[in-house]
């Protein structure tokens, strides 16, 4: 046996140093060729900082699946790794340089990359420590990084192959442009915020007839790049001016007036200016009508030489100056305040500019079509859990646009394309040009999602034909949030299909976002973020893990709730105390279960244990972790602790040594299986308890999943135990209601619905007597009877001389008076607008909860009073 368990559960003591031992023992290293492989690749966290609560949730789900599969006999590879996170990391390193009073341009590209690698090593170490604190069963011998040599080779090969097949090209498109970072952004790097702006209505004079058109815009600074004015062809107000020209008040140029059914006749004045280089919709119109696409803004967000006297101004400074000049010139018709969604750079915080730029693109339609075709083939499709997210996935692929993959950064995979300095020829290849002095490599790097899109196979050694790639690809399960289905899951799907002609994973388990207790997304701006390491310090990793995975179903958001984490901690404490009790009974010797000497209570708890095994296994295989957790909570708290342990306190004092031995064996067997069931959820405390009990293996990490226990039991035996337990609850409730001392003997009679007496077995009668001092009798000699419907029977109690009904009436009337006053007080507060509108929402809800509780108690007390008064 291990050491004597501590009197109190201490999560800090239990979790200290345990993880390092597991890693040193190699419990999580994959490679047992005798077993069926199961592979999960971790969604690589960015090396930009510490893990947040969403990471803790995502990785805990994966860890539970991997630990479960190991116990089921699989060779599990859970592959860890991290993402270089292009713009995010570069922004962090830039900020650190700024603190030193320098910029990346001062030190140059090579030195900057050295600093970025230093950053990566610093934060990779932090992330590994956090993984350890969470207890994640990762195979660190296979850890990867999106910029390591192997992955860089994979990235280069996919780029070259796509290019050679005509699926990568250079072209001009409207992209998200960050004027501060001076780079293109992916959609996920743009946060849309509702801000108060203005809608400006300006007058444009028609050249041919002098009529004035009023046109609205939110971005006057882009007017210098206007190329046309559009109206709807069916709009009678403007049919006669199509083909004419109107003067652009910003620069005096005559703009052609054109017609297109894209224009919404019900919006504003139904006249739209077209600025092709600064708006994606205008860009599409310009392509359709072959309009020029001049750019009026520099990459840093200042106005260029097109803008005359406004050249050199910041874009927003230009806006203000231009509007002021328009007002002086009488060009402004009117200005309205306008709430609208505006994209901001996630990294620098500046407003993103839709911007025409020459970039590298992936031609998406052929790649998407191949994925969509394979989604119709059962053994090739990606299965989504929940299924509804497959529609989200396929709809996006069906409407996909070409993907801008170039970024104007230094940190990342540099694009393997060179331009010949003399001829302008483009070379793209796996090897650098043999005469590098004659070639200029593209300065840009690839979008971070390009490399992370290869994660499912590049991490296993591709493009080399490695043993791991052969054994573990395609991977089995990806766990990720619904917010990156487009950005990551879809990209993994089409890049893997292109490179490997296969799916990246068989299943995708989708979870939601972690929100605060008010349902708000956690963010720095709201200051409502929670550091999982703080929670672990205060409550332990096991409590956090159990909370995260048992309070949300697949695809749903999770609300962070400290009271539920407390509940998880209390549950673990309950297990700890139960284990201490079992340890004290069992001692050093591992008891052997003899299924031929089982009591009624033994058979009942083992039957429940078998039911739980079946349900838990089924739901684990379905990814229904919350259902598993809730079932285990109920089984441990209610069945094992509240019932079987209490029942055992009677049988352990039996004079029959076989009964005592059987009770000890069942206590031990069920507890060990509880530890196995819960070990994927709470690995630290289950390991601690396991090692403190007599045990078969050196660690719970190498234990096997419980199996069905065969023993002889009839349905009648199970129903008798259920009936007796229900009878005990009913007798206790009656004694409590009528203030009868718990130790007072009471005569009861158990009968069927047809009023036939139900005789109990000796086991069952002994339990009834021990647990509630009740004796089951065929005849009750009493004129004061009280009945309750219980499970499988009707229970009748002989109440003679046990209750002073007059005294009970007085007590109940007093309680009813108290409850009425509380209800009146709470109702008054909730009818007070000053309280409801000004008090914190949590306080108002507490008062509502109190009112509901008082009303429920009042109804119950009034029913008790009615019962008592019938006896008077």
Report the location of each language-model feature:
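N-terminal, positively charged nucleic-acid-binding surface of large information/translation enzymes
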Residues: 2-234, 258, 275-288, 292-306, ...
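Catalytic cores of large soluble enzymes that bind and process phosphate-bearing ligands
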Residues: 6, 10, 14, 53-57, ...
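Active-site-adjacent bridging/hinge elements
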Residues: 34-42, 64, 100-103, 128-135, ...
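Structured ligand/cofactor/substrate-binding pocket environments in proteins
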Residues: 54-66, 73, 82-83, 151-154, ...
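Secondary-structure transition/capping motifs at alpha-helix termini
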Residues: 67-75, 96-109, 129, 133-138, ...
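Short Cys/His-rich metal-coordination motifs, predominantly Zn2+-binding knuckles/fingers
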Residues: 181, 251, 348, 420-423, ...
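Short acidic-hydrophobic surface loop/beta-edge motif
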Residues: 200-206, 244-249, 343-347, 418, ...
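Feature 926 captures the class I aminoacyl-tRNA synthetase adenylation module centered on the KMSKS loop
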Residues: 201, 395-450, 454, 498-541, ...
């Amino acid at each position: 046996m291990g050491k004597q368990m501590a009197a109190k559960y201490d999560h800090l003591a239990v979790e200290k140093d345990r993880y390092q031992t597991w890693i040193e023992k190699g419990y999580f290293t994959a490679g047992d060729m005798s077993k069926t492989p199961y592979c999960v690749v971790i969604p690589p966290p960015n090396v930009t900082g510490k893990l947040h609560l969403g990471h803790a949730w995502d990785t805990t789900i994966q860890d539970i699946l991997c630990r479960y599969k190991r116990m089921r006999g699989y060779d599990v590879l859970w592959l860890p790794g991290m993402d270089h996170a292009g713009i995010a990391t570069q922004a962090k390193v830039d900020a650190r340089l700024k603190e030193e009073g320098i910029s990346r341009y001062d030190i140059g590209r090579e030195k900057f990359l050295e600093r970025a690698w230093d950053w990566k090593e610093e934060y990779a170490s932090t992330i590994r420590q956090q993984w350890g604190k969470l207890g994640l069963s990762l195979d660190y011998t296979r850890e990867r990084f999106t910029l390591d040599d192997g992955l860089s080779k994979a990235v280069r090969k996919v780029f070259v192959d796509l290019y050679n097949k005509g699926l990568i090209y250079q072209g001009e498109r409207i992209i998200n442009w960050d004027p501060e970072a001076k780079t293109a952004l992916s959609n996920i790097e743009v946060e849309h915020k509702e801000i108060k702006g203005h809608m400006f209505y300006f007058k444009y004079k028609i050249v041919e007839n002098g009529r004035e058109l009023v046109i609205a815009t939110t971005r006057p600074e882009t007017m210098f790049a206007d190329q046309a004015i559009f109206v709807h062809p069916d709009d009678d107000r403007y049919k006669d001016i199509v083909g004419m020209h109107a003067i652009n008040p910003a620069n005096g140029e005559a703009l052609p007036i054109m017609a297109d059914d894209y224009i919404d006749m019900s919006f504003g004045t139904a006249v739209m200016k077209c600025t092709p280089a600064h708006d994606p919709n205008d860009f599409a119109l310009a392509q359709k009508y072959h309009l020029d696409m001049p750019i009026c803004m520099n990459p840093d967000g200042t106005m260029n030489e097109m803008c005359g006297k406004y050249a050199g101004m910041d874009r927003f400074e230009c806006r203000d100056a231009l509007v002021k000049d328009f007002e002086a010139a009488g060009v402004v018709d009117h200005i309205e305040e306008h709430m609208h969604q505006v994209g901001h750079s996630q990294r620098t915080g500046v407003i993103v500019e839709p911007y025409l730029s020459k970039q590298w693109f992936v031609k998406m339609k052929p790649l998407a079509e191949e994925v969509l075709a394979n989604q119709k083939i059962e053994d090739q499709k990606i299965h989504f859990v929940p299924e509804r997210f497959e529609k989200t996935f396929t709809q996006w692929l069906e409407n996909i646009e070409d993907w801008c993959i170039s970024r104007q950064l230094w940190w990342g995979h540099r694009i393997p394309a060179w331009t010949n300095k003399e001829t302008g020829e483009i070379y793209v290849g796996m090897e650098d040009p043999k005469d590098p002095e004659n070639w200029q490599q593209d300065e840009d790097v690839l979008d971070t999602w390009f490399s992370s899109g290869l994660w499912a196979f590049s991490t296993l050694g591709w493009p080399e034909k490695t043993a791991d790639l052969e054994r573990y690809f395609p991977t089995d399960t990806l766990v990720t949030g619904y917010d990156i289905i487009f950005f990551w899951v879809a990209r993994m799907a089409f890049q893997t299909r292109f490179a490997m002609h296969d799916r990246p994973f068989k299943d995708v388990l989708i979870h939601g976002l972690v929100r605060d207790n008010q349902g708000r997304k956690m963010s720095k701006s709201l200051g409502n973020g929670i550091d999982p390491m703080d929670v672990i310090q205060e409550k332990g990793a096991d409590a956090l893990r159990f909370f995260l995975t048992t309070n949300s179903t697949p695809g749903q958001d999770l609300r962070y709730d400290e009271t539920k984490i407390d509940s998880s901690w209390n549950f673990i404490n309950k297990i700890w105390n139960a284990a201490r009790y079992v340890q004290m009974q069992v001692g050093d010797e591992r008891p052997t279960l003899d299924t031929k000497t089982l009591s009624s209570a033994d058979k009942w708890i083992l039957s429940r244990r078998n039911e739980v095994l079946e349900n838990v296994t089924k739901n684990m295989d379905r990814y229904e972790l919350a259902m598993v957790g809730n079932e285990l909570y109920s089984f441990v708290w209610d069945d094992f602790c509240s019932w079987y342990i209490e029942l055992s306190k009677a049988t352990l004092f039996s004079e029959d040594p076989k009964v005592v031995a059987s009770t000890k064996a069942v206590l031990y067997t069920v507890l060990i299986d509880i530890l196995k069931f819960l070990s994927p959820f709470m690995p630290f405390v289950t390991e601690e308890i396991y090692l403190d009990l007599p045990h078969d293996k050196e660690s719970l990490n190498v234990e096997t999943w419980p199996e069905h226990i065969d023993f002889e039991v009839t349905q009648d035996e199970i129903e008798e135990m259920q009936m007796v337990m229900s009878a005990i609850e009913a007798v206790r409730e009656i004694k409590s209601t009528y203030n009868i001392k718990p130790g007072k003997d009471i005569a009861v009679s158990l009968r069927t619905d047809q009023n036939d007496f139900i005789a109990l077995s000796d086991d069952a009668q002994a339990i009834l007597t021990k647990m509630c001092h009740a004796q089951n009798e065929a005849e009750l000699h009493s004129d004061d009877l009280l009945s309750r419907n219980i499970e499988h029977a009707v229970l009748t109690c002989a109440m003679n001389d046990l209750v002073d009904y007059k005294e009970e009436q007085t007590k109940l009337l007093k309680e009813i008076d108290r409850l009425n006053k509380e209800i009146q007080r709470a109702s008054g507060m909730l009818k007070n607008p000053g309280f409801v509108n000004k008090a914190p929402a949590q306080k108002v809800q507490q008062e509502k909860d109190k009112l509901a509780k008082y009303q429920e108690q009042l109804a119950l007390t009034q029913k008790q009073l009615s019962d008592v008064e019938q006896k008077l």
